[in-house]
């Protein structure tokens, strides 16, 4: 073959001549001519034999793929598909910047790193003439690729475009693999080349179809911005299936004529062909399988997951949750009712764990009270639709509820609050909206308590009421502060309740004068520790005797125990100053309005 005898003037310069850049051809001739002849001297006899054998195999493959079409025709047919080269993608390694601009088969720059042709780059890695050897072999394979695509072009002009663009996508996925072969010996690299020739099933079946489908709407000029990095391995893979079969697959894909979005950027930096294959199959073409990939993503969470959130988030944003459920409710009433039952059960368990009042465990009789009240007071509102009456029941609850998130609604007078909130909540106005009424349950049971209407900002005033003894008997708690009987919450509750429970105006100043120790002695106890009535008999019996007997000894031991010996948490002790009898305490409680007889 003439290519074997004249390498510098052989196929290495034909693409440059056909593209029409004479400057790059002349520069290549001038730079390569001096060193390419002497580049054989650095090769051993085995390497030369390997190169000649590679050329013969390439020539035989060219004749097989040609099948009657000459090289000139194939070049003229395929060069319009890749008309413009990319000067930006790859830098010139040896300082020849003008060579890159004119040549279409860009991969000649990357050829020294190719695993298919290692002998030249290994022995002559630093010489500029070393690029000629693998470059020519590379061009032979590139020509083979072009001939196969022109054969398919005669059958199906639209499908051959996809076959040309197919190797380009594959080149990038394998561009990093050849750089590992710089350190391998030539024989091992040749064995690797032989091992890479048979393509996997995924490349043989799905890849040409997907690429032919992906490149159908593109014009020939749009293929130019794709960086051609390494076509040697891809040309080996695309050489295996028959061109007729590939063109038939491409024509089948082209006959569908689906509009496909443009291909994703081809920067699949996979090390081996298998992982690059998987990356292109899984993430590269979303248009191939649109339905299973995109369908599960916008799936919403089921309503019970949203409902089983913490108590603080429930209080902070009850309005959003109610509107969310009233949106989901009109479509399917039965899941709404089941989710409400699950919500009640979850709230009941959470309240038991937190030690909060358990009168919230029976929300339905509690909630029916304000709704009955509204039915009595707002008789004129019953006529439009019966579904609006349950819609107003949760509307009255936020206006009276003590939730911190409801502070702006509570700052308004009650009548505009009742007007504003139904405007938001009664808009569904259907019967399933009535099923979402028990959602603002934590605010409903407090509708009758006068303290919480006045003091919405303290979060612990939930548990306060006008009759503290009755209220605090109804729950068990692990700590004092969690159950809402902390000193600060007690003070704020007393200050808030003073205008209602007293007839004189000196009650507020009296509260300010009281020291915290007196308040600590007189405030109601949680149910787990018992109320004051439980300890009255003990006070008269054992503790009174201890006070009379102990005297100063007991006081000194008390001072020691406060500093050194911590009191066990399960024991509750009422500490009163010496000489203060129970009558004084009762009088103080009566003045405070806490003790009613």
From Swiss-Prot:
It comes from the Eukaryota. It is found in: Cytoplasm. Keywords: Cytoplasm, Phosphoprotein, Receptor. InterPro entries: SARG. Residues 1-40, 63-477, 492-585 are annotated as: Disordered. Residues 20-39, 328-339 have a biased composition (Low complexity). Residues 96-109, 342-352 have a biased composition (Basic and acidic residues). Residues 68-81, 141-157, 307-321, 492-506 have a biased composition (Polar residues). The modification Phosphoserine is found at residues 130, 132, 515. GO terms for cellular component: cytoplasm. The keyword Phosphoprotein applies. Putative androgen-specific receptor. Belongs to the SARG family. This is Specifically androgen-regulated gene protein. The lineage of its organism: Eukaryota, Metazoa, Chordata, Craniata, Vertebrata.
